[in-house]
Amino acid sequence: MPAIEIGRICVKTAGREAGRKCIIVDIIDDNFVLVTGPKSLTGVKRRKVNIKHLEPTDKSIKIPRGASDEEVLKAIGENGLTDYMVEHVKPKLTPI
């Protein structure tokens, strides 16, 4: 199970969105990924994030690369993870 893969649910550990869950939508390079909440569900806006600022969880959903927020919302609903995505988590603080 690769930790950083498309569809992996992660917790943001840095910034104003720390503690909120997001989903990896695209892998940009070795250090950066594109994530989305989507904003209407978790408050995490679609943006490029350093992988050092993400904490992968054991859950993932099946979405295509570069999926839109609507596709992500549909996949979350189909997998019954809506309540899981909305709850906030205190991220584990690890030195970078």
Curated annotation (Swiss-Prot):
GO cellular component terms given for this protein: cytosolic large ribosomal subunit
A matching Pfam family: KOW
Domain of life: Archaea
Gene3D superfamilies membership: 2.30.30.30
Ribonucleoprotein found in the keyword field: yes
GO BP, one annotated term: ribosomal large subunit biogenesis
Single Gene Ontology MF annotation: structural constituent of ribosome
Record bears the keyword Ribonucleoprotein: yes
Keywords: Ribonucleoprotein, Ribosomal protein
Family: Belongs to the eukaryotic ribosomal protein eL14 family.
PANTHER family registered for this protein in UniProt: 60S RIBOSOMAL PROTEIN L14 (PTHR11127), LARGE RIBOSOMAL SUBUNIT PROTEIN EL14 (PTHR11127:SF2)
Name of this protein: Large ribosomal subunit protein eL14
